[in-house]
Amino acid sequence: MRLILDTVTFIWAVSAPERLSRAAASALLKSTTVREVSVVSLVEIAVKQARCKLTFSKADVTAGVEDLQLRVLPYSARHAFHLFDLPTHHADPFDRQIIAQALAEDLAVVTPDNAFYLYKGLKVVW
């Protein structure tokens, strides 16, 4: 199974793993799971950290990627073109980009955000 963590899931997995659901934690621990985080999440964390809305540091991100053995998924034009076809179930531009990536790459998204379930064809783990 290939999984992509949304931003809050990545942060929780690193700093507060007890906040993960059992299904999410189990999926992340499976040795056969390919775990990914979007470069979009790294941008979102950097933006929020710069605006003092988050205390998650660059070192936290780097350590989290290493500790969780995550592949950082680049964002491509192919991903961006998926945005044109997405309904607007919610307006968060970072989430929408992660959804577009997940659909383009056939990834399941690990997220506590119920709005993700509204996107047809999107696989969600929580």
How does the language model describe each region?
Residues 1-37, 51-63, 67, 105, ...:
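Short, well-structured N-terminal submotif of metal-dependent ribonuclease cores
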Residues 53, 57-58, 67-114, 125:
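Active-site neighborhoods of divalent-metal-dependent phosphate/nucleic-acid chemistry enzymes
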Residues 45:
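Phosphate/NTP-binding elements of NTP-utilizing enzymes
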